[in-house]
């Protein structure tokens, strides 16, 4: 019998083993769609970003007007820009849901996959931050100033580090140029990391909603899950295009329609919505270094989740107390996001501090305690 090219060709067999003949648990739900959605988000962002880069000028005097030119004079430039800007929001929606899924179903016990995933999240956050600076509007400039300035809280080397990152004594032309270079480079780094992420995942195979080994019941990825993924793509592209066509500036800051001016500070400097939870945690500590450490901890705490898993069961599917805690954490993150968008005034300050405290308490203290308690209740 003639050899099947799909299974023998050095490159095709790589694709075959990842996307066609991959043994997949038969019961994975729609929560397992977000990995492929993140992949399609990345592809969309790279494609639209490349088209935008062909019309963009990384210079403080021209950046703002080059973006305006793209929207006004380039064929479908407005659409490409709107898809790129809102695509970032969908990227973050997908990654947060993907992390939430991993957390709920105990996928973090695949430690290598989980850790590379967190590195991917950090790379995505860095990419989104440097990308937000490129249009050189007011919020771009002041956001860059505020966030890069946080590094000056690092003892001894802080100020030197910030001036080295800026390429001068303030956010200026060298900063914009290097941010453009980084914004171009990082997505390709993300693509490489995603490949590593998948390699680790395929070592152990996917987890499933029951959190039990599924070797006894695996089905081929194609056609079952390839079709399911295509449905996922349609379900995601529908709201994305709707947003980009009908309300493209819904999630943006109106302040960014004003060209950057170092002499005028906007009344409320705040990041895009997907960073607000971390921004709220940063602001909740009335000390610069403490705030920076809390900000870093808000994401880096995810590295500890595999070590804090005390339950004998992997998923939360049959653990009502952990479920309650999980959804409390989700509600808490919504509160943090809301507080991050509010000015630093009386009720919001204390709400932010309580929500930040609750966030770390749930993750570091309550989850392991409740996990151990549930073991006791089940006589494990």
UniProtKB/Swiss-Prot annotation:
UniProt cross-references to SUPFAM superfamilies, sorted A to Z: a domain/subunit of cytochrome bc1 complex (Ubiquinol-cytochrome c reductase), Transmembrane di-heme cytochromes
Pfam families: Cytochrom_B_C, Cytochrome_B
Transmembrane feature ranges: 34-54, 78-99, 114-134, 179-199, 227-247, 289-309, 321-341, 348-368
Membrane association type: Multi-pass membrane protein
Biological process terms in GO annotation: mitochondrial electron transport, ubiquinol to cytochrome c
Cofactor(s) the protein needs: heme b
Stated name of the protein: Cytochrome b
Keywords (A to Z) from UniProt: Electron transport, Heme, Iron, Membrane, Metal-binding, Mitochondrion, Mitochondrion inner membrane, Respiratory chain, Transmembrane, Transmembrane helix, Transport, Ubiquinone
Binding site for heme b b566: 98, 197
Family: Belongs to the cytochrome b family.
Binding site for heme b b562: 84, 183
Matches recorded under Gene3D superfamilies: Cytochrome Bc1 Complex, Chain C
Xref: InterPro entries: Cyt_b/b6_C (IPR005798), Cyt_b/b6_C_sf (IPR036150), Cyt_b/b6_N (IPR005797), Cytb/b6-like_sf (IPR027387), Cytochrome_b (IPR030689), Cytochrome_b_C_euk/bac (IPR048260), Cytochrome_b_N_euk/bac (IPR048259), Di-haem_cyt_TM (IPR016174)
Function: Component of the ubiquinol-cytochrome c reductase complex (complex III or cytochrome b-c1 complex) that is part of the mitochondrial respiratory chain. The b-c1 complex mediates electron transfer from ubiquinol to cytochrome c. Contributes to the generation of a proton gradient across the mitochondrial membrane that is then used for ATP synthesis.
GO terms of molecular function: metal ion binding; ubiquinol-cytochrome-c reductase activity
Note: Heme 1 (or BL or b562) is low-potential and absorbs at about 562 nm, and heme 2 (or BH or b566) is high-potential and absorbs at about 566 nm.
Entry superkingdom: Eukaryota
Assembly with partners or alone: The cytochrome bc1 complex contains 11 subunits: 3 respiratory subunits (MT-CYB, CYC1 and UQCRFS1), 2 core proteins (UQCRC1 and UQCRC2) and 6 low-molecular weight proteins (UQCRH/QCR6, UQCRB/QCR7, UQCRQ/QCR8, UQCR10/QCR9, UQCR11/QCR10 and a cleavage product of UQCRFS1). This cytochrome bc1 complex then forms a dimer.
PROSITE patterns from the UniProt entry: CYTB_CTER, CYTB_NTER
Subcellular location: Mitochondrion inner membrane
Entry's Gene Ontology cellular component terms: mitochondrial inner membrane; respiratory chain complex III
Binding site for a ubiquinone: 202
Cofactor mode of binding and number, as noted: Binds 2 heme b groups non-covalently.
Organism of derivation: Alle alle
């Amino acid at each position: 019998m003639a050899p099947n090219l799909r299974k023998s060709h050095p490159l095709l067999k790589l694709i075959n083993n990842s996307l066609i003949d991959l043994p997949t648990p038969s019961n994975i739900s729609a929560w397992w769609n977000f990995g492929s959605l993140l992949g399609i988000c990345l592809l969309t962002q790279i494609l639209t970003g490349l088209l935008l880069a062909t019309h963009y000028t990384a210079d403080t005097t021209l950046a703002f007007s080059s973006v305006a030119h793209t929207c006004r004079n380039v064929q479908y430039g407005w659409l490409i820009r709107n898809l790129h800007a809102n695509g970032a929001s969908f990227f973050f929606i997908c990654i947060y849901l993907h992390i939430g899924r991993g957390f709920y179903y105990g996928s973090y016990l695949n430690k290598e996959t989980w850790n590379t995933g967190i590195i991917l999240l950090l790379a995505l956050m860095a990419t989104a931050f440097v990308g937000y600076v490129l249009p050189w509007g007011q919020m771009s400039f002041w956001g860059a100033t505020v966030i890069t300035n946080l590094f000056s809280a690092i003892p001894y080397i802080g100020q030197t580090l910030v001036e080295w990152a800026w390429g001068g004594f303030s956010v200026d032309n060298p900063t914009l140029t290097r941010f453009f270079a980084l914004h171009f480079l990082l997505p390709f780094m993300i693509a490489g990391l995603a490949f590593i992420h998948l390699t680790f995942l395929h070592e152990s195979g996917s987890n499933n909603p029951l959190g039990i080994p599924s070797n006894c019941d695996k089905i081929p990825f194609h056609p079952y899950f390839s079709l399911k993924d295509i449905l996922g793509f349609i379900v995601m592209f529908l709201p994305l295009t709707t947003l980009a066509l009908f309300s493209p500036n819904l999630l943006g800051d109106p302040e960014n329609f004003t060209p950057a001016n170092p002499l005028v500070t906007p009344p409320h400097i705040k990041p895009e919505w997907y960073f607000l939870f971390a921004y709220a945690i940063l602001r909740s500590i009335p000390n610069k270094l403490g705030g920076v450490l809390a900000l870093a901890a808000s994401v880096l705490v995810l590295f500890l989740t595999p070590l804090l898993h005390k339950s004998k069961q992997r998923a939360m599917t049959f653990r009502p107390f952990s479920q309650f805690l999980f959804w409390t954490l989700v509600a808490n993150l919504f509160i943090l996001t809301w507080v991050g968008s509010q000015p630093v005034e009386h009720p919001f300050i204390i709400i932010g501090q309580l929500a930040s405290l609750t966030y770390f308490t749930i993750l570091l203290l309550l989850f392991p305690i409740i996990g151990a308690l549930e073991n006791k209740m089940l006589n494990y």
